[in-house]
């Protein structure tokens, strides 16, 4: 359905078509020339989302996507004739024949898709831009470049933590954000928000929602200061992944620290433990290569042992 492909209008590109000559049955040359056209011609004229199969038309040839046909109760808004019973096969073929690149092609993505389907991929593209969480920094880049950028340009606020062990995460309430780096990989944004009930604390990984990228879990603990015995714990089986930090109050996935837990302290002295859900694709490929090399070494050792045995005989 077209509603699944897009939620907003996009900047369109012009698609070129080749120019060639063919001959008809009588041997005469018939010129067939292609022209440039705007991709928004392949959008539903009603909702302006990308057309995807099934596409319907009325008897007068007006087209609409399936979701619009349902919303309009199968009545064409242009001529009031019934629409939604007959599919526009030729329009479906045109839409499927137009191939477009991923919007992140300039950042390294080489994927191509039928028109409209690239938006579905864009949400999970590992080349989607991520934004630097440092205040007053406008840098954006692919997630791996962002990590090196933060280390080089914001080293004074750089904090590295390891895997599977609790480490200190001391967040100054006035600064609202603490950035941690998980090993040599993802940046973790720990944020606090002052609300009526207390302090909201969130933990997010700055990474695209691509398979094998920034897939982490975490545990967060806060102990009542000044000798208190109370400890708060917050655990998430899967850390949220974001491309850009937001300073709007979260509606879910936060730890609430009541003000009476804070005392007069201006710093949230927490501890955090981060674990990886599964290996990144690149690390998995490296492991496979190392396993293959080990297998080759084992085979060579077996061959050497067989040769030694033959010599002894």
Swiss-Prot record:
Region (SBD): 94-277
Pathway noted in the entry: Protein modification; protein ubiquitination
Entry EC number(s): 2.3.2.27
GO molecular function: transferase activity; zinc ion binding
Zinc finger (SIAH-type): 97-155
Zn finger residue spans: RING-type: 44-80
Catalytic activity, as annotated: S-ubiquitinyl-[E2 ubiquitin-conjugating enzyme]-L-cysteine + [acceptor protein]-L-lysine = [E2 ubiquitin-conjugating enzyme]-L-cysteine + N(6)-ubiquitinyl-[acceptor protein]-L-lysine
InterPro entries tied to this protein: Sina-like_RING (IPR049548), SINL_plant (IPR044286), Znf_RING (IPR001841), Znf_RING/FYVE/PHD (IPR013083), Znf_SIAH (IPR013010)
Comp. bias (Acidic residues): 282-313
Region called Disordered, residue ranges: 1-26, 278-313
Pfam families: Sina_RING (PF21362), Sina_ZnF (PF21361)
Stated role: E3 ubiquitin-protein ligase that mediates ubiquitination and subsequent proteasomal degradation of target proteins. E3 ubiquitin ligases accept ubiquitin from an E2 ubiquitin-conjugating enzyme in the form of a thioester and then directly transfers the ubiquitin to targeted substrates. It probably triggers the ubiquitin-mediated degradation of different substrates.
Protein known as: E3 ubiquitin-protein ligase SINA-like 2
Organism the protein comes from: Arabidopsis thaliana (Mouse-ear cress)
């Amino acid at each position: 359905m077209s509603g699944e492909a897009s939620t907003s209008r996009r900047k369109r590109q012009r698609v070129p078509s080749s120019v060639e000559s063919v001959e008809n049955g009588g041997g005469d040359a018939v010129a067939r020339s292609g022209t440039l056209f705007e991709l928004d011609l392949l959008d539903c004229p009603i909702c302006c989302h990308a057309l995807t199969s099934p596409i319907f038309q009325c008897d007068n040839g007006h087209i609409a996507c399936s979701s619009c046909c349902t919303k309009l109760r199968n009545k064409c808004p242009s001529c009031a004739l019934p629409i939604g019973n007959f599919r526009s096969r030729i329009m479906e073929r045109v839409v499927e024949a137009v191939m477009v690149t991923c919007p992140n092609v300039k950042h390294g993505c080489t994927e191509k898709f039928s028109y409209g389907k690239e938006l579905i991929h864009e949400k999970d593209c590992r080349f989607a831009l991520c934004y630097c969480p440092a205040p007053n920094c406008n840098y954006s880049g692919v997630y791996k470049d962002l990590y090196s950028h933060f280390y080089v340009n914001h080293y004074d606020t750089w904090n590295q933590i390891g895997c599977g062990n609790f480490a200190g995460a001391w967040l100054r309430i006035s600064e609202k954000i603490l950035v941690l780096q998980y090993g040599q990989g993802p940046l973790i944004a720990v944020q606090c928000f002052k609300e009526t009930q207390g302090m909201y604390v969130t933990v997010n990984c700055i990474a695209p929602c691509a398979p094998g990228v920034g897939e982490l879990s975490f545990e967060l603990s806060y102990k009542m200061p000044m000798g208190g015995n109370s400890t708060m714990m917050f655990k998430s089986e899967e850390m949220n992944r974001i491309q850009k930090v937001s300073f709007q109050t979260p509606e879910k996935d936060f730890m609430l620290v009541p003000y009476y837990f804070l005392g007069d302290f201006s710093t949230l002295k927490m501890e955090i433990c981060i674990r990886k859900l599964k290996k990144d694709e690149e690390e998995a490929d490296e492991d496979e290569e190392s396993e293959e090399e080990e297998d080759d070494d084992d085979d060579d050792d077996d061959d050497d042992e067989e040769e030694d045995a033959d010599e002894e005989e």
